[in-house]
Amino acid sequence: AMTQTELLKMIGSGAVRDLDLTGRELKNIDFKGCRVENVTFDECTLTECNFDGCGMERVSFRKAVLRNCRFRRAKIAWSDFRYCEIERATFEEAEIRFCDLYRAMLTGIVIMRRARIGETSLYYAYFGEGVNIRRENIAGGRLLQQDLDAYRRFLIEWNTSGTGVRRNDRAEQSAWSPD
């Protein structure tokens, strides 16, 4: 497994790629301005981590807990936030595209000012009262599930560009995977 020192060295190089950090406890890590690609934070607890200005692709935060994390002006694509708990965060001016927030829970103050969310699934996501998502945050003013053809394309694309075939809690392939 990668040590904290090795991780910080990788961050210092400006690119964090092809890493599996499943189940790790990460505190006060500053990824600011990094390229973060093909990284798995599944079931991690991230506290006070800074992803401001990051370019993030194929990053999985599945079942992770994010507390007081920052994603200001981050560009996040093809990333997995399913069952993720996001508690107090800022996504101010972030661009979120082709992501899956199925059953994600956002609680506390989560700042979405001028964030753009497009081609993203918010199916069964829970937004607490401190989360202010406005229509102008949603690209084209529509969510993916409201446009079934687009949603189906997203599910098919997700299997090639995203973080892989969706599975449900019982590790079976989800019924709402595309055929």
Indicate where each model-derived feature is located:
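Tandem repeat scaffolds
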Residues: 2-178
